[in-house]
Design a protein with these regions (language model features):
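Second-shell loop/turn segments in exported
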Residues: 135-138, 181-183, 227-229, 244-250
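Short, glycine-/small- and polar/acidic-enriched structural segments
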Residues: 28-175, 180-191, 208-210, 216
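Secondary-structure end/capping motifs
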Residues: 231-276
């Protein structure tokens, strides 16, 4: 498991975080709530490390990291001012902003999108058009859902050609491995789901990346409310500066980042890693 998360962290940290930087200044601690897209996984390791090792505290931020229920939900909570910042799919954020949500991206993690259709290798599916009439699993509020209709259209398919079924996020991979209800594929990220499938005994899935079908987009972004940008730009800059520092540390020391997640979620990951 530790190797799994270390690989995800290394892939995630080879990314761009884009934001304006200013000179170092002393700040009073601000209470900040960060909303993640899902429960903790490898791509979140920089946030976890920054919390555990005091990076955010050093930048005057008292951070409260909350798990989420999908990218759309995470960004929506920022738009509703439940949370100060969100981490999730840029596609989901763009979709919400286009509908009037008062949010903007202030930073990018994973500059290249990782969204894909992941297919069981024993399904007989060789091309994306072979998915016609097949069942595909996903989770409600997942950012990967946003541009799936465009992928289908660019491949010469209609939404009605496939059977999309929502399952809980925690059951997505297990349902895929069991072929639940005849499912042959899931919608997910190349940055974590293939590794999770293999870690649970599954074979390497066949991948149809969205980018192969005309959907080239930024992967995951950090978003905040327009009012934060307008009224407290210094906080936004400090948050991104601290995040950049934390992810740089995670890239240099992925084991520490994995341990930081373990510290937060209760140590089960660290215990399993210790048996490796």
């Amino acid at each position: 498991m530790k190797n799994l998360f270390s690989n995800i962290i290394k892939n995630t940290c080879n990314c761009a975080i884009i934001i304006l930087l200013t000179s170092a200044t002393s700040f009073a601690a601000d209470k900040v709530k960060l909303r993640l897209n899902w429960m903790y996984y490898g791509s979140h390791a920089g946030f976890a490390l920054g919390f555990v090792d005091g990076t955010y505290e050093k930048h005057g931020i008292d951070i409260d990291i909350r798990s989420g229920n999908g990218s759309s939900s995470a960004h929506r909570l920022v738009a509703n001012k439940d949370s100060h910042f969100s981490y999730g799919s840029c596609g989901a954020m763009t979709d919400l902003a286009s509908k009037g949500a008062p949010i903007k991206s202030i930073g990018v993690i994973d500059a290249m999108g990782t969204e894909a259709i992941l297919v069981r290798p024993d399904s007989g599916v060789k091309t994306i058009k072979d998915l016609k009439g097949k069942k595909i699993l996903t989770t409600a509020n997942a950012g990967v859902n946003t541009f799936f209709p465009i992928v289908l259209a660019n491949a010469g398919l209609k939404e009605s050609d496939v059977n999309i079924t929502n399952v809980p996020d925690g059951a997505l991979v297990s349902s895929y491995l069991q072929g639940s209800g005849g499912a042959v594929a899931i919608l997910g990220g190349l940055d974590d789901k293939p590794a999770e499938i293999k870690a649970n005994g599954g074979a390497q899935p066949i991948a149809f990346p969205y980018s192969d079908f005309g959907v080239n987009q930024v992967g995951y972004c950090i978003a905040t409310h327009n009012d934060t940008i307008r009224n407290n730009p210094g906080l936004a800059k400090r948050f991104i500066r601290a995040t950049m520092e934390a992810y740089a540390k995670a890239e240099k020391n992925p084991d520490a980042a994995v341990d930081a997640i373990a510290d937060i979620v209760g140590g089960s990951m660290a215990e399993e890693a210790g048996r490796k």
